[in-house]
């Protein structure tokens, strides 16, 4: 096992930020009126988006894994898989930063990284990979009964969704509504949005956002919509 650093400053914070930006680039989009001034942060999501290392129940039991640091010294014989945007082919810099964090902070140096899979969950379920890095809100973690490894030391990057814009162009009601939306984006809210935009029949981001806003009572449903009494989720 590798002696892991304790209490070190996050010297690779810019690189970790690159990992998050790359991961979210394909899942989010910006909209609005262009502004002459630089945008400012208006509100952040209540829930945290973080990468999470997951394994099957069989792998967790065989290697006695509970925490990501339990992988220390055990990754050399394992194959790992990351989300498609974080592969070396898609973004070499982000992939290098992510692998360096795993090596330095968790002592995990997988023998192989899968390079051509579009579905990391399916790869780990089929034992093509033994460790998958997924967003913690990925609904497939529970659906496939995968085991998320604890990460109290924040080895893997995390962050929040942030609404940006010009406060000077917004009235109090608009700012309040933005804050309401971001407050509803807690862990469950983020998981619901991810369920709508992933899977076998994903919705386009704008359509998924509309369904989510209507379900949370943050937008009126169009007249031709059928809205269930409970929730779509």
Feature-to-residue mapping (PLM):
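A ligand-binding cleft/hinge motif common to bilobed small-molecule-binding domains
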Residues: 13-24, 32-38, 122-150, 155
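A conserved helix-loop-strand patch within extracytoplasmic ligand-binding domains
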Residues: 40-87, 183-187
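Short helix-initiation/N-cap motifs at beta->coil->alpha
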Residues: 1-19, 107-123
